[in-house]
């Protein structure tokens, strides 16, 4: 038995001994993915993708299906938890220079785009007021594409407005995309384990490695347990914490909500979109707010990998995080002064992070060289 245990331990993936709690969010994301897939499957059994029945079918799930309320709330709150984890995961990658593992970073960026698409399609499915109008506003951005825009939008909608065919295809895509995400997540993990995890100091992890189990696996289990505890606490005491009050009303194309906005986890991108008065410019800025992450591995100029020992870049990083929160906040506000100006300034600072970061890295190199 002892020999078997030794054999098992020697085959487990060795990991750097000093990786911190920030490295636990990957496993938390896997737990979120498993939760969303399982609860989503049970919801899909009872859901009806028809504009006349969709809203009623969600009400039926909440009222009549045994534990349907738990499934629906877990799925809705789980989506928010998913994005909290993924934004933390990305911030950790930016702070500790993990983007230098190019294949992992680029596959992760593709995963983020797929996740955002999946969440958007899912938000439309209950066919509430905000679902309908958010879908109308966002899909209408396709018309900004020169020459092909109107044709693409009509093809995407399945008609000349958002209607029954749109809801049907959104449901089909919302059901299909998670399986693509699972496949890509597997590739993401394989690519990570090809090189191995980095650490907070940015030193060579081969110097001091320990088996993943039990040292890091128990840490993963602890963080997943805390996340699930928080998830169930919100579900039990404040299930509608992340819901929009407008979405408790059935979609009505004749009544426009006073302030159209998507779910909170899209507000930073929506805020950037709104800050530019031109439709095509706003659409490009919206896309670039995600795509710009792919530039990080190619613009790294510092001799040191993480920001742990780079005070100037740390100030820039926390300015970037504050900017992200500011854009999210302004996107919840109406399009009027002073929110428009705040949003425009914050959006500019958001993109400036990716321009100033390599310049600061080069400056810090010069300072280090001069002190030596």
From Swiss-Prot:
GO BP = mitochondrial electron transport, ubiquinol to cytochrome c
Q: Where does heme b b562 bind?
A: 75, 174
Q: How is the cofactor bound?
A: Binds 2 heme b groups non-covalently.
For binding a ubiquinone, which residues are annotated in this chain's numbering?
Answer: 193
Q: Which UniProt keywords apply?
A: Electron transport, Heme, Iron, Membrane, Metal-binding, Mitochondrion, Mitochondrion inner membrane, Respiratory chain, Transmembrane, Transmembrane helix, Transport, Ubiquinone
GO cellular component entries: mitochondrial inner membrane; respiratory chain complex III
Instruction: State whether keyword Heme applies.
Output: yes
| Transmembrane annotation, as ranges | 25-45, 69-90, 105-125, 170-190, 218-238, 280-300, 312-332, 339-358
Tell me the CDD domains matching this sequence. cytochrome_b_C (cd00290), Cytochrome_b_N (cd00284)
Q: Where in the cell is it found?
A: Mitochondrion inner membrane
Q: How does it sit in the membrane?
A: Multi-pass membrane protein
Residues where heme b b566 binds = 89, 188
Cofactor(s) needed by this chain: heme b
UniProt-listed InterPro entries: Cyt_b/b6_C, Cyt_b/b6_C_sf, Cyt_b/b6_N, Cytb/b6-like_sf, Cytochrome_b, Cytochrome_b_C_euk/bac, Cytochrome_b_N_euk/bac, Di-haem_cyt_TM
Q: Which domain of life is it from?
A: Eukaryota
User: Which Gene Ontology terms cover its molecular function?
Assistant: metal ion binding; ubiquinol-cytochrome-c reductase activity
Similarity field? Belongs to the cytochrome b family.
Q: What does this protein do?
A: Component of the ubiquinol-cytochrome c reductase complex (complex III or cytochrome b-c1 complex) that is part of the mitochondrial respiratory chain. The b-c1 complex mediates electron transfer from ubiquinol to cytochrome c. Contributes to the generation of a proton gradient across the mitochondrial membrane that is then used for ATP synthesis.
Assembly state and interactors? Answer: The cytochrome bc1 complex contains 3 respiratory subunits (MT-CYB, CYC1 and UQCRFS1), 2 core proteins (UQCRC1 and UQCRC2) and probably 6 low-molecular weight proteins.
Additional remark text:
Heme 1 (or BL or b562) is low-potential and absorbs at about 562 nm, and heme 2 (or BH or b566) is high-potential and absorbs at about 566 nm.
Q: What is this protein called?
A: Cytochrome b
Phylogenetic placement of the source organism: Eukaryota, Metazoa, Chordata, Craniata, Vertebrata
| Gene that this sequence comes from | MT-CYB
């Amino acid at each position: 038995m002892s020999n078997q245990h030794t054999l098992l331990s020697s085959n487990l993936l060795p990991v750097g001994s000093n990786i911190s709690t920030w490295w636990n969010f990957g496993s938390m994301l896997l737990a979120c993915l498993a939760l969303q897939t399982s609860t989503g499957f049970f919801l899909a059994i009872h859901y009806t993708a028809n504009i006349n029945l969709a809203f009623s079918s969600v009400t039926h799930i909440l009222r009549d299906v045994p534990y349907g309320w738990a499934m629906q709330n877990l799925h809705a709150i789980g989506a928010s938890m998913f994005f909290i984890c993924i934004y933390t995961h990305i911030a950790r990658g930016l702070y500790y220079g993990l983007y230098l593992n190019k294949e992992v970073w680029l596959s992760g960026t593709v995963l983020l785009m797929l996740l955002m698409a999946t969440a958007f399609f899912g938000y439309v499915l209950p066919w509430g007021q905000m679902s309908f109008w958010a879908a109308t506003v966002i899909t209408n951005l396709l018309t900004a594409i020169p020459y092909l825009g109107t044709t693409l939008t009509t093809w995407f909608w399945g008609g000349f407005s958002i209607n029954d065919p749109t809801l049907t295809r959104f449901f089909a895509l919302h059901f299909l995309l998670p399986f693509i995400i699972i496949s890509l997540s597997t590739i993401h993990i394989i690519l990570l384990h090809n090189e191995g995890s980095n650490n907070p100091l940015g030193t060579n992890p081969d110097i001091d490695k320990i088996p993943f189990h039990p040292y890091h696996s128990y840490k993963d289990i602890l963080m997943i347990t805390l996340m699930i505890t928080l998830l169930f606490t919100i579900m039990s005491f404040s299930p509608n914490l992340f819901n929009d009050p407008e979405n408790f009303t059935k979609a009505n194309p004749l009544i426009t909500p006073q302030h159209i906005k998507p779910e909170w986890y899209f507000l930073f991108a929506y805020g950037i979109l709104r800050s530019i008065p031109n439709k095509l410019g706003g659409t490009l800025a919206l896309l670039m707010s995600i795509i710009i992450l792919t530039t990080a591995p190619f613009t790294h100029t510092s001799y040191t990998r993480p920001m742990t020992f780079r005070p100037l870049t740390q100030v820039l990083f926390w300015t970037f995080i504050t900017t992200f929160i500011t854009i999210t906040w302004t996107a919840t506000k109406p399009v009027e002064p002073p929110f428009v100006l705040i949003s425009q300034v914050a959006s500019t600072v958001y993109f400036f992070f990716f321009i100033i970061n390599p310049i600061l890295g080069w400056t810090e190199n010069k300072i280090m060289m001069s002190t030596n």
